[in-house]
Design a protein with these regions (language model features):
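Sigma70-family region 2
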Residues: 11-12, 38, 48-66, 85-86
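Alpha-helix N-cap and coil->helix boundary residues
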Residues: 20, 41-46, 65, 69, ...
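Arg/Lys-rich amphipathic alpha helix in sigma70-family domain 2
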Residues: 75-93
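Internal acidic/polar
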Residues: 88-109
Length: 109
């Protein structure tokens, strides 16, 4: 199916839009996600989240280049997921520890 036909299905709110998108661009989106995440499960979740985001975004928005639109969504979702996982590996505390020390410093002055 052509991209315009898939986009029309999104505008009609037909679930067939997701099926056709997966047939045509599932491998493309998965490759983007896997190159970032290096995990089959996380990549599959990112692709599913991509379809959900496309479903919620396309009507009223109409992408000019559907593959680029999906690729950008997949990339952003995958990077966000990677950042969350990286933060958890570091303990997930991040700036919180610094804020506590800063508060101690301000109280001492």
């Amino acid at each position: 199916m052509e991209d315009q036909g898939i986009i029309d299905l999104f505008f009609e709110r037909s679930e067939q839009a997701i099926t056709e998108t997966d047939k045509k661009y599932g491998g493309y989106c998965y490759a983007i996600a896997y190159n970032i995440l290096s995990s089959r499960e996380d990549s599959e979740e990112s692709v599913s989240d991509t379809y959900l985001t496309a479903w919620n975004t396309i009507p009223p928005r109409k992408p000019n280049i559907f593959s680029a639109f999906l690729g950008k969504i997949t990339r952003h979702i995958s990077i966000d997921r990677w950042r969350k996982q990286s933060a958890q590996k570091r303990g997930g505390k991040g700036v919180t520890g610094l804020a506590t020390k800063e508060e101690d410093f301000v109280q001492d002055v």
